[in-house]
Design a protein with these regions (language model features):
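Walker A/P-loop
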Residues: 279-301
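Mg2+/Mn2+-dependent nuclease catalytic core
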Residues: 74-116, 125, 130-226
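Conserved RecA-like P-loop NTPase helicase motor core
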Residues: 651-663, 715-828
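A contiguous, basic/glycine-rich beta-loop/short-helix subdomain that forms a polymer-engagement track
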Residues: 394-414, 419, 430-437, 538-654, ...
Length: 862
């Protein structure tokens, strides 16, 4: 049965929002300040669950815990449902006496603040000018419990947002005629409580000392509370009406929208496959060679699915900025043909921050100061003016309204139909967009994962963690004069790491490593890391403005990541110790297979499409990206004729380590020279490493220099301007041949689009196999045990992917002509040949003294 929403229905749309989300959005105010948590930060939420249960369990009498409440309001063109769970509801038989409110024992650390019957209040502004209670029947009270990391005895009034949450629950009780309470009474019991007034209690609990409690009680009449609640709802309704009107325009714009170009060979099948995947809530692996138009082939059906009600949002995810530009262009093409879809390209904080460097607090940044006072107006204004939001648009609006552009961009994304961003915004537990992917949150999201081959290493990086012994010692030195308990905790952790270091020093080998499997040892490490992290949390809360915070910040995040990763580890992880580049002991939690972690994030959406020009072998990627058995794969045929290219394999070249030397480098240099001499144009030669590249380049310059051939080499540290200057050497119809010396897997090996005569040849040196190292060997061992295919998983598949990406820089359009030269005899082995794309079936093996003749024949036929 289809879950398609009825887009032609005249029924008003139902919009649901939690009480907490409503008040936090409408009533937020103040500064951005990364030096402090907001009283209810992530840590407090985790610990708060325990405190909630303890407080609720201790209540006696008629106290009801976790009471679900909801109210639907017809707002004309939509229905708004506000819902949530009240922490507690109870009756108060004697509203003027504080003891009557409490059904459990009050500890000596409990503080109670109440508005008395005469209307006096030690906390101005909570209950001003309310009439005295004239109905002596028991009154219902809503209890809102908040666990915070501070001495709650210092609080003089509740936070506005917290109190507003409780008031919303109280208002819903009025609106529902107290049904949640009355229906919970025994069948033969008549409700006996005041129906015109209601009490609200804010219960604050110190999470570090949960016997410290501070309670604030206030009283509201029906009329005043419902008027307040309606004002909150009306303010939110403005946003809802704007969004609904936009969706109507968006969906109407899709009526006449068709695929913007004539379908290329195989492209229509891609579009249909993506559409069926979304309808079926499935996952698709799509390999489409350059020229098929894969980006539009996934974006167009996704847009149609949103317009037809199958999905709410599109997340277009990439690993590199260049690919984001390609995705944005696809949405712009559809917009040029009438599509009205709000689309945002998210930029990292570092790249969009208008300050010299991000320092997100009101003392250092004017955009952080009062940000939350202005940001809602800034966002609403921008949504009314534009449909496409990139870095320049966001930054201009943020400066005009004096708000943080990064945070404003995230708020704008909440009201968009398509979000284009880095992988980590969706998949990284440390950086994902919590408004969409936070714990327990799900939606009808479509994940379009571009250049999906890059997700393998990125995912392993996201879900791995590590801690360095020297960092622990450095942190101990910083805190020893501030907190003895923190210093002791760090010293205990250091001792555990020292024991591992001593054991590692006994391991022979050039790059020794030690795999830890003893559960007792691992348990001690986890406990000491948790204890040290807990002490640092306390230290950070108690010294919010201390200068040492800056020194500790990196280590704080390091150990936080380590602790959270440790807690979620399973048998897809390997724990090992080695020495890092600085010869310091590093203890690593290495995620060898990220499939389960990725699946948990993908399951928060509707469906996912993983697409790339290089997803071979597809089963390799399936096992690394998903745990589902039923996934689908589509391999699109290239639209280009075989006559447009020639693939040559140099059978007399070996790039194995033992074969490297001057004679082999000379042979490779000659291959490059003869390839470039066969026809004037632009070429790129890709090498497995910088050292290999420079060794060959040295011989090329000395022995094969030609007056009519220029060359340029990639350097290790190139900024964006350096890259642009490098690519400017590859222009149309050059008068002289240009050879670019590049590195496989680098910035010029993928994501660049040099069409026509801007690039007519790619020489790929070696199979791209990763260097033998600790992690590659751990991967080989793991996958040998799991699949019996350890070498291929650790070395061949990642290496050949780099080869395919590098070679894919040639032949970008149906007008292009070019050559691909693969230099390594291993390309002719069965394992490598199985990974050749279909378009390479007519490859030509040859030796260095034959390559010129092969190329001459090819170019003569063009």
């Amino acid at each position: 049965m289809s879950d398609k929403k009825d887009i032609v229905s005249t029924e008003p749309e139902l919009i649901r929002i939690s009480v907490r989300s409503l008040v936090e959005f409408i009533l937020r105010s103040g500064d951005i300040d990364n030096r402090t948590g907001s009283g209810v930060d992530t840590e407090a939420m985790l610990a708060g669950g325990r405190v909630h249960r303890k407080i609720q369990k201790g209540k006696a009498g008629d106290y009801r815990a976790e009471v679900p409440l909801a109210w639907e309001m017809d707002r004309g063109d939509f229905v708004l449902r506000v819902e949530g769970r009240a922490d507690g509801i109870f009756t108060d038989a004697h509203p003027s006496k504080s003891e009557a409110y409490v059904n459990d024992t009050i500890s000596e650390d409990t503080i109670y603040m109440d508005k008395d019957a005469e209307g006096d209040d030690d906390r101005p502004g909570l209950c001003d000018d309310r009439p005295r209670l004239c109905d002596d029947r028991p009154r219902l009270c809503v209890d809102e419990i908040k666990g915070i990391y501070m001495d709650v005895r210092e609080l003089t009034e509740p936070q506005e947002v917290h109190l507003a949450q409780a008031k919303c629950y109280a208002a819903i009780l009025f609106l529902t005629d107290f049904a949640a309470w009355d229906d919970s009474l025994p069948d033969d019991t008549e409700p006996e409580h005041n129906r015109e007034r209601i009490g609200v209690r804010m219960t604050y609990v110190d999470l570090e000392h949960d016997d410290r409690i501070n309670m604030f009680d206030s009283d509201y009449g029906r009329e005043e509370l419902l008027a307040w609640f309606d004002s909150i709802v009306e303010r939110y309704s403005l946003w809802c009406r704007h969004h609904i009107e936009h969706k109507r325009k968006r969906d109407a714009s899709m009526g006449p929208l068709t695929f913007p170009f004539e379908y290329r060979t195989g492209q229509k099948n891609l579009v249909s496959s993506v559409y069926r995947t979304i309808l079926g809530k499935q996952e698709l692996f799509l390999m489409a060679p350059t020229g098929v138009g894969k980006t539009l082939s996934v974006v167009y059906p996704s847009v149609r699915a949103v317009g037809q009600g199958y999905a709410d949002m599109i997340f277009y995810l990439t690993a590199k900025n260049q690919t984001l530009t390609v995705g944005a262009e696809a949405f712009r093409i559809l917009a040029d043909r009438g599509l009205l879809m709000k689309t945002i390209v998210l930029t990292s904080k570092e790249k969009i921050c208008p300050m010299n460097e991000p320092s997100c607090n009101p003392d250092d940044c004017p955009y952080a100061r009062g940000h939350f006072d202005r940001v809602n107006d800034a966002v609403f204004d921008l949504l009314e003016k534009k449909d496409y939001f990139d870095r320049d648009v966001i930054l201009t609006q943020a400066k005009e309204w004096n708000v943080c552009p990064f945070e404003m961009g995230l708020d704008v994304a909440s009201w968009c139909d398509a979000v284009l961003c880095d992988y980590n915004y969706a998949f990284d537990p440390k950086a994902h967009l919590r408004r969409f992917f936070g714990e327990g949150k799900k939606g009808d999201y479509i994940f379009l994962v571009d250049e999906a081959h890059n997700l393998v290493d990125r995912a392993r990086e996201m879900y791995s963690a590590g801690i360095v012994k020297e960092d622990v010692l450095a942190a101990k030195k910083v805190v020893k004069n501030v907190s003895r308990s923190a210093a002791r905790a760090l010293e205990r952790l250091n001792k555990e790491l020292l024991a591992i270091k001593k054991e590692l020093l006994l391991v022979d080998g050039r790059n020794p490593y030690l795999v830890l499997t003893d559960s007792t040892v691992l348990g001690r490490i986890q406990n000491e890391a948790l204890r040290a992290f807990g002490e640092l949390q306390i230290l950070f809360r108690e010294h919010r403005d201390a200068s040492f915070r800056e020194e500790l910040l990196d280590f704080y995040f390091e150990i936080s990541d380590f602790v959270s990763t440790f807690e979620g580890m399973d048998d897809d992880y390997v724990v090992y110790a080695d020495f890092n580049e600085e010869e310091h002991l590093s203890l690593n939690l290495f995620c060898v297979n990220p499939a389960r972690n990725l699946q948990s994030m993908i399951d928060r959406g509707r469906s996912a499409v993983f697409f790339s020009a290089t997803l071979l072998p597809v089963d390799y990627y399936k096992k690394l990206f998903t745990t589902r058995e039923e996934t689908y794969a589509v391999y699109a045929r290239s639209p280009f004729a075989s006559e447009q290219k020639v693939v040559i394999v140099g059978s007399d070249v070996s790039t194995r380590y033992r074969s490297r030397g001057a004679s082999m480098y000379r042979k490779i240099a000659r291959y490059i020279h003869d390839t470039a001499m066969a026809r004037r144009g632009n070429y790129m030669a890709f090498f497995p490493s910088y050292k290999f590249m420079t060794d060959v380049l040295s011989i090329y310059r000395t022995e094969f220099d030609e007056a009519d051939i220029n060359w340029v080499a990639q350097s290790r540290y190139m900024n964006e301007m350096d890259r642009e200057i490098f690519l400017e050497n590859f222009y149309e119809d050059p008068e002289m041949t240009m050879v670019g010396f590049c590195v496989m897997g680098g910035v010029f090996a993928e994501g660049i689009d040099l069409v026509g005569s801007r690039l007519i040849g790619a020489i790929v040196v070696g199979c791209g196999l990763p260097q033998v190292g600790t992690r590659t060997e751990l991967l080989r061992t793991y996958y040998e045990e799991k699949t019996g295919d350890g070498f291929n998983y650790a070395y061949l598949y990642p290496g050949m992917n780099k080869v395919l990406q590098s070679a894919g820089r040639v032949i970008r359009t149906d007008q292009d002509r070019g050559v691909i030269v693969l230099l390594d005899d291993r390309f002719l082995t069965a394992d490598c040949l199985r990974m050749f794309p279909r378009e390479w079936t007519e490859y030509v093996p040859c030796k260095v003294d034959q390559v010129r003749a092969v190329l001459d024949r090819f170019w003569e036929g063009v």
